[in-house]
Amino acid sequence: MMKNRVTNIHFVGIGGVGMSGIAEVLHNLGFKVSGSDQARNAATEHLGSLGIQVYPGHTAEHVNGADVVVTSTAVKKENPEVVAALEQQIPVIPRALMLAELMRFRDGIAIAGTHGKTTTTSLTASILGAAGLDPTFVIGGKLNAAGTNARLGKGEYIVAEADESDASFLHLTPIMSVVTNIDEDHMDTYGHSVEKLHQAFIDFIHRMPFYGKAFLCIDSEHVRAILPKVSKPYATYGLDDTADIYATDIENVGAQMKFTVHVQMKGHEQGSFEVVLNMPGRHNVLNALAAIGVALEVGASVEAIQKGLLGFEGVGRRFQKYGDIKLPNGGTALLVDDYGHHPVEMAATLAAARGAYPEKRLVLAFQPHRYTRTRDLFEDFTKVLNTVDALVLTEVYAAGEEPIAAADSRALARAIRVLGKLEPIYCENVADLPEMLLNVLQDGDIVLNMGAGSINRVPAALLELSKQI
């Protein structure tokens, strides 16, 4: 067992959302955990409060005494800590391999898919918690009810996100898996081949043992395409009545979704029951159906499912409501923050906002993430951004990429302006965005702050500015 051979575990890039969660679980299991990161953030502060040594920056000395070094995808081979570890013959492994090791100690439930992983993982953990199963979880966002993105439970299950962006989900060996959808994103990883993307998801499903079970969303065209090649046991879910688990009578009730769940899954009692999900959006109905499927498979009751969905307190940066902010011209606007950065998930979130607040003006502040994604999905971005009532665009968050002139925010603004419906406002520096938004907003507006980059700092700055009014 790992515990007999490994004592000290060092994380390079420990502040990353996937890394910090695994570090916390290992710390709670009794391992001596340390880590380093270029930037301080809420995750590094939280880990420090637990007694974990977090070093600012990267130097070779940080790996001294480590039995294994864990790296995130963002960490380069030239990193001085990685170089020093290899020179000292200390194993250097990717984050997903350490997650796979955690799964060896418990029954793993791995949630994969291009969109909806974090919410589905969180909903699954919430229902299993309501069922008294006390799961361990590692999530790509902060579960609001727990105040953290990871927790060591006493139960037999571990619920974790499975990351397809670098194909690292192929390291995992869960007993149950979910595929929420498949979309053409991170295509550099798959040589820009849809066939290779499909094969990766098939291989992920086949990582389960013969007694495992996958839950696959048939509302996704790409998921439907791989079904004939899946040879492990699976059940389908979706909004179509041919699915093994499906939803009808879907209704927006304010910022909640009410719907009827129908179960016609082999080996389970057939029937239907009503649920209320404490978050808006039809896409979240699908995420809830996946969590319901997993919950039924592990023996959770209908009552536990209803309790887990109604009591769900949400996830950080997934339609996260900050409440009303005061405006300089009088009145207030509701501030909502979201991680969405792909046109498909953005469209779903904007539809959720329209459904929850149908009479309100919707103002979007958006920071595109990566020049290559903006280039590859330029038309899709233009279409979805043109659906709001007012738009403020800040410059692309490069994530280490070189700028691409025809795929920056100025180009997006020009393309949207040509369509004739909106006059986008361009904000070159994201630091200027809070003040700019206060001048754009009107009483009663919904302002949606969206993106996966440095725009995540805007809500706190906007709230601070608003307090001074």
Curated annotation (Swiss-Prot):
Keyword Cell cycle tagged: yes
Gene3D superfamilies in the cross-refs: Mur ligase, C-terminal domain (3.90.190.20), Mur-like, catalytic domain (3.40.1190.10), NAD(P)-binding Rossmann-like Domain (3.40.50.720)
Gene Ontology terms for molecular function: ATP binding; UDP-N-acetylmuramate-L-alanine ligase activity
Positions with a binding annotation for ATP: 113-119
Location in the cell: Cytoplasm
EC numbers on record: 6.3.2.8
Protein name in UniProt: UDP-N-acetylmuramate--L-alanine ligase
Taxonomic source organism: Neisseria meningitidis serogroup C / serotype 2a (strain ATCC 700532 / DSM 15464 / FAM18)
